[in-house]
Amino acid sequence: MDVMRSVLGMVVLLTIAFLLSVNKKKISLRTVGAALVLQVVIGGIMLWLPPGRWVAEKVAFGVHKVMAYSDAGSAFIFGSLVGPKMDTLFDGAGFIFGFRVLPAIIFVTALVSILYYIGVMGILIRILGGIFQKALNISKIESFVAVTTIFLGQNEIPAIVKPFIDRLNRNELFTAICSGMASIAGSTMIGYAALGVPVEYLLAASLMAIPGGILFARLLSPATESSQVSFNNLSFTETPPKSIIEAAATGAMTGLKIAAGVATVVMAFVTIIALINGIIGGVGGWFGFEHASLESIVGYLLAPLAWVMGVDWSDANLAGSLIGQKLAINEFVAYLNFSPYLQTAGTLDAKTVAIISFALCGFANFGSIGVVVGAFSAVAPHRAPEIAQLGLRALAAATLSNLMSATIAGFFIGLA
């Protein structure tokens, strides 16, 4: 029954996308079908097949080992505030976001910058990009951008496509925006993992977002023009570093900007939510609903969607609330509020944990529209009106991609 509910959830999400399509007659069943199959296959390999699960677990273990080294830099700056005795001192509440999550982002961004400099990232992106281009029958630039989102965030995509921005047709531009919103960057992935989100789920979600973003981009805005972009040499940065030291330093400074942005936005929105909840609770108290909150309202509204995705009805309000927080605010705030349930074993069943983890894994939120419009407009001011028109539709496509990955994850966890 649960498995059939997951299948129903996939059908519901595809139906929503079809209804939102701007040109239903031009939908390519070849691309859409291949993207859906590939998204399911990646989920099955990493979540259900024993060899795939083994590889995912080993990679997750390696990521955790690498993350642990970030504590060395944190301890040098913050001393015992990142030590193991903090949990004992504060009775299990010694995890300090600013001392554990933000330094990890800086460390990993510097590490990724080094890997770009020595060519490792370029090789991976070219190999994966070629595979997805042929499998999905899409243009090279679409495949290139989609695969790059595994490592880079939506803020960096405009710099990647800048040399070709004038030759991108409307569909390619839309796909690039969708891919950025549907994914997460490698640096922020480490931040989510530090909050307790299973790394193997984050890895699987990142890979599934590649075909998922393309799937819903092509459903909502089918390709109607041929690609005009032709290139052999792909560049990942406008001014490549001249040494490995410069690469590390540049990456660290970029990581600092990301960490500062994360801290600022999280602090601001947590405060705003607290204010809104205070107002809602105060007004609700007049009518006997003193415990009403923004989370509870959003949870009730999205609970049916969470249920059809595979979440048990008893947890549907929580799942709906977290999905709503991710959409209205951002994924970091949603993961931050999800974290306490991950720290306490047995609070949620494995399937619910998987579905929520996948559903929140993406940059798709209303704030991202402003980020995308601002970032793309900076490199192509003359296309700003066009980009602004695509923003809301891209948000819908990216959100559906995240929810589809979550539904597929629930399907395979239910089979395990």
Q: Residue ranges of each PLM-predicted region?
A:
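Hydrophobic core segments of alpha-helical transmembrane domains in multi-pass membrane transport
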Residues: M10-L20, A35-L47, I105-I114, S183-G191, ...
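Interfacial/capping segments of alpha-helical transmembrane domains
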Residues: I45-L81, S227-S230, I276-L301, S314-L322
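Alpha-helical membrane segments and immediately flanking helix-loop junctions
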Residues: A135-A193, G320-I408
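Transmembrane helical segments that form the transport core of multi-pass membrane transport proteins
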Residues: M253-T344
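Long, contiguous bundles of hydrophobic transmembrane helices that form the permeation core
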Residues: L207-I258
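Juxtamembrane inter-helical linkers in multi-pass membrane proteins
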Residues: R126-I160, S226-A247, L294-V298, K326-L327
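Hydrophobic alpha-helical hairpins/lids featuring a short glycine-rich hinge
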Residues: A68-I138
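Structural signature of hydrophobic alpha-helical transmembrane segments
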Residues: M1-V11, R100, A292-L294, I356-F366
